[in-house]
From Swiss-Prot:
Localization of this protein: Cytoplasm
Function: Could be a nuclease involved in processing of the 5'-end of pre-16S rRNA.
HAMAP family tied to this protein: Nuclease_YqgF
One CC-aspect GO term: cytosol
Keywords noted in UniProt: Cytoplasm, Hydrolase, Nuclease, Ribosome biogenesis
Organism, as annotated: Thermus thermophilus (strain ATCC 27634 / DSM 579 / HB8)
GO molecular-function terms, A-Z: nuclease activity
Main location: cytoplasm
UniProt name for this protein: Putative pre-16S rRNA nuclease
Taxonomic lineage of the native organism: Bacteria, Thermotogati, Deinococcota, Deinococci, Thermales
Pfam families with a match to the protein in the record: RuvX (PF03652)
GO biological process: rRNA 5'-end processing
Amino acid sequence: MRVGALDVGEARIGLAVGEEGVPLASGRGYLVRKTLEEDVEALLDFVRREGLGKLVVGLPLRTDLKESAQAGKVLPLVEALRARGVEVELWDERFTTKLAQERLKHAPKRLRRDKGKLDELAAVVLLEDYLARGI
Protein backbone atom coordinates (compact mmCIF):
# COMPACT_ATOMS: atom_id res chain seq x y z
CA MET A 1 0.00 0.00 0.00
CA ARG A 2 1.20 3.51 -0.79
CA VAL A 3 1.54 5.65 2.30
CA GLY A 4 1.88 9.42 2.60
CA ALA A 5 3.36 11.48 5.41
CA LEU A 6 2.63 14.99 6.63
CA ASP A 7 4.91 17.19 8.68
CA VAL A 8 2.40 19.81 9.82
CA GLY A 9 3.82 23.16 10.81
CA GLU A 10 2.45 26.63 11.43
CA ALA A 11 3.03 27.90 7.89
CA ARG A 12 3.59 24.79 5.76
CA ILE A 13 2.84 21.08 5.53
CA GLY A 14 5.71 18.93 4.29
CA LEU A 15 4.70 15.99 2.07
CA ALA A 16 6.29 12.59 1.43
CA VAL A 17 5.26 9.25 -0.06
CA GLY A 18 6.46 5.68 0.26
CA GLU A 19 5.43 2.07 -0.04
CA GLU A 20 4.81 -0.30 2.86
CA GLY A 21 7.58 -2.89 3.02
CA VAL A 22 10.17 -0.50 1.56
CA PRO A 23 11.92 1.73 4.15
CA LEU A 24 12.55 4.61 1.73
CA ALA A 25 10.40 7.69 1.17
CA SER A 26 10.35 10.42 -1.45
CA GLY A 27 9.55 14.06 -0.82
CA ARG A 28 6.60 15.57 -2.63
CA GLY A 29 7.10 19.22 -1.78
CA TYR A 30 4.98 21.17 0.65
CA LEU A 31 1.71 23.02 0.96
CA VAL A 32 1.46 26.56 2.24
CA ARG A 33 -1.16 26.53 5.01
CA LYS A 34 -4.36 28.45 4.51
CA THR A 35 -7.66 27.76 6.23
CA LEU A 36 -8.45 24.36 7.71
CA GLU A 37 -10.93 23.59 4.92
CA GLU A 38 -8.49 24.65 2.18
CA ASP A 39 -5.75 22.55 3.79
CA VAL A 40 -8.07 19.52 3.91
CA GLU A 41 -9.07 19.94 0.24
CA ALA A 42 -5.42 20.26 -0.83
CA LEU A 43 -4.49 17.16 1.18
CA LEU A 44 -7.43 15.17 -0.24
CA ASP A 45 -6.11 16.07 -3.70
CA PHE A 46 -2.63 14.87 -2.62
CA VAL A 47 -4.10 11.56 -1.39
CA ARG A 48 -5.99 11.02 -4.66
CA ARG A 49 -3.14 12.14 -6.92
CA GLU A 50 -0.62 9.84 -5.22
CA GLY A 51 -3.03 6.90 -4.78
CA LEU A 52 -2.44 6.76 -1.02
CA GLY A 53 -4.12 4.23 1.24
CA LYS A 54 -3.02 5.94 4.45
CA LEU A 55 -1.50 9.15 5.80
CA VAL A 56 1.03 9.16 8.61
CA VAL A 57 0.88 12.49 10.41
CA GLY A 58 3.61 13.68 12.73
CA LEU A 59 2.35 14.28 16.27
CA PRO A 60 4.49 16.84 18.10
CA LEU A 61 5.33 15.39 21.50
CA ARG A 62 7.47 16.82 24.25
CA THR A 63 10.46 14.85 25.48
CA ASP A 64 8.29 13.54 28.34
CA LEU A 65 5.99 12.03 25.64
CA LYS A 66 3.10 14.40 26.39
CA GLU A 67 1.46 16.32 23.56
CA SER A 68 3.07 19.68 22.87
CA ALA A 69 1.15 22.91 22.27
CA GLN A 70 1.66 22.35 18.53
CA ALA A 71 -0.21 19.02 18.78
CA GLY A 72 -3.37 21.00 19.47
CA LYS A 73 -2.95 22.58 16.04
CA VAL A 74 -2.33 19.26 14.28
CA LEU A 75 -5.26 17.31 15.74
CA PRO A 76 -8.09 19.38 14.16
CA LEU A 77 -6.54 18.73 10.74
CA VAL A 78 -6.30 15.00 11.51
CA GLU A 79 -9.93 14.85 12.63
CA ALA A 80 -11.08 16.73 9.52
CA LEU A 81 -9.20 14.29 7.27
CA ARG A 82 -10.65 11.29 9.12
CA ALA A 83 -14.14 12.79 8.77
CA ARG A 84 -13.56 12.84 4.99
CA GLY A 85 -12.68 9.13 4.98
CA VAL A 86 -8.88 9.28 5.03
CA GLU A 87 -7.11 6.68 7.14
CA VAL A 88 -4.70 8.62 9.37
CA GLU A 89 -2.12 7.29 11.77
CA LEU A 90 -0.38 9.60 14.23
CA TRP A 91 3.37 9.13 14.61
CA ASP A 92 5.86 10.61 17.07
CA GLU A 93 7.69 13.33 15.19
CA ARG A 94 10.19 14.32 17.85
CA PHE A 95 13.56 15.17 16.32
CA THR A 96 12.42 14.84 12.69
CA THR A 97 13.23 18.48 11.96
CA LYS A 98 16.67 18.11 13.59
CA LEU A 99 17.36 15.00 11.49
CA ALA A 100 16.17 16.82 8.37
CA GLN A 101 18.49 19.74 9.18
CA GLU A 102 21.35 17.27 9.53
CA ARG A 103 20.59 15.82 6.08
CA LEU A 104 20.56 19.32 4.59
CA LYS A 105 23.82 20.33 6.25
CA HIS A 106 25.92 19.73 3.14
CA ALA A 107 23.29 20.77 0.60
CA PRO A 108 23.70 23.95 -1.45
CA LYS A 109 22.95 27.12 0.51
CA ARG A 110 19.75 27.84 -1.47
CA LEU A 111 18.31 24.51 -0.28
CA ARG A 112 19.41 25.02 3.32
CA ARG A 113 17.61 28.38 3.37
CA ASP A 114 14.38 26.97 1.89
CA LYS A 115 12.11 26.30 4.87
CA GLY A 116 9.69 24.42 2.64
CA LYS A 117 12.47 21.99 1.69
CA LEU A 118 13.12 21.44 5.40
CA ASP A 119 9.41 20.67 5.97
CA GLU A 120 9.41 18.26 3.02
CA LEU A 121 12.53 16.50 4.29
CA ALA A 122 11.06 16.28 7.81
CA ALA A 123 8.08 14.43 6.26
CA VAL A 124 10.54 12.09 4.51
CA VAL A 125 12.34 11.38 7.80
CA LEU A 126 9.01 10.78 9.55
CA LEU A 127 7.81 8.35 6.88
CA GLU A 128 11.11 6.48 6.69
CA ASP A 129 10.96 5.96 10.46
CA TYR A 130 7.40 4.65 10.14
CA LEU A 131 8.23 2.36 7.20
CA ALA A 132 11.40 1.01 8.84
CA ARG A 133 9.35 -0.24 11.77
CA GLY A 134 7.31 -2.37 9.39
CA ILE A 135 3.92 -1.30 10.70
